[in-house]
């Protein structure tokens, strides 16, 4: 299982850096993680910094979904690094703004013992960069390769999440991924979180039903 420890998230949680400076740290950490480690003090240390960020963002909302949303975001942020080879951090407050248009969304619903839907929404430039990171191919404009790449990423990630739920005796089935353009999500028990990455910012959306 991937570690939930993230040097860059520890730094971000301490509010020491403006967003532009944090983006520079993410880019540099992608090339050499020790560059971020040198900025880390003992006071910054947190073995589960993504969990800390998501719990703060949720506060007292959606208590029945809290464990699932926190666990999913920990898995999502780990996958950013292991599957997309991209350094990223998540905000500690809910996201309320829609993405700049044109933007694209990819999501997938899990049904069974629980109902859960999750995915991402990104402006076109960021969506393409994320697709390039996953496919390891250049994608200069929106096409089927971009769409298919992020559908596959979400499908693999959500499959891993479904397996982790199964280990807790929570059985779920994966539905087919969904794709949308210029989406303003409105799911039940919805949580939107902004993720800042070395290729740009986007949002992760979690809900108990489809939001596309």
Region locations from a protein language model:
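Mixed-charge, glycine-accented linear interaction segment located at domain edges/termini
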Residues: 156, 160, 164, 207-212
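Alpha/propeptide regions of enzymes that mature by internal proteolysis
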Residues: 148-152
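Low-complexity, intrinsically disordered Gly/Pro/Thr-rich segments
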Residues: 182, 186-194
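A short, glycine/Asx- and small/polar-enriched loop/turn
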Residues: 33, 100-102, 186-189
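Generalized protein targeting/export and membrane-interface segments
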Residues: 14, 42-43, 53-144, 194-212
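Non-catalytic accessory regions
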Residues: 1-67, 78
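Long, charged, glycine-rich C-terminal linkers/tails
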Residues: 89-99, 170-183
């Amino acid at each position: 299982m991937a570690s939930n420890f993230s040097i860059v998230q520890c730094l971000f949680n301490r509010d020491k850096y403006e967003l532009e400076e944090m983006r520079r740290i993410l880019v540099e950490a992608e090339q050499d993680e020790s560059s971020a480690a040198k900025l880390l003090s003992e006071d910054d240390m947190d073995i589960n910094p993504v969990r800390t960020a998501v719990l703060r963002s949720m506060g007292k909302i959606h208590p029945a979904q809290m464990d699932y949303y926190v666990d999913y975001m920990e898995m999502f942020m780990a996958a950013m690094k292991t599957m997309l080879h991209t350094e990223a951090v998540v905000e500690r407050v809910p996201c309320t703004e829609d993405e700049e248009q044109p933007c694209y969304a990819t999501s997938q619903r899990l049904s069974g013992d629980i109902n859960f839907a999750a995915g991402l929404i990104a402006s076109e430039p960021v969506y393409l960069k994320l697709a390039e990171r996953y496919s390891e191919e250049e994608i200069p404009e929106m096409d089927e390769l971009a769409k298919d790449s992020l559908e596959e990423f979400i499908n693999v990630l959500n499959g891993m999440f479904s397996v982790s739920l199964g280990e807790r005796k929570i059985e779920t089935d994966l539905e087919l991924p969904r794709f949308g353009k210029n989406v303003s999500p409105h799911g039940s028990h919805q949580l939107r979180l902004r993720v800042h990455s070395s290729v740009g910012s986007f949002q992760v959306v979690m809900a108990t039903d489809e939001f596309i």
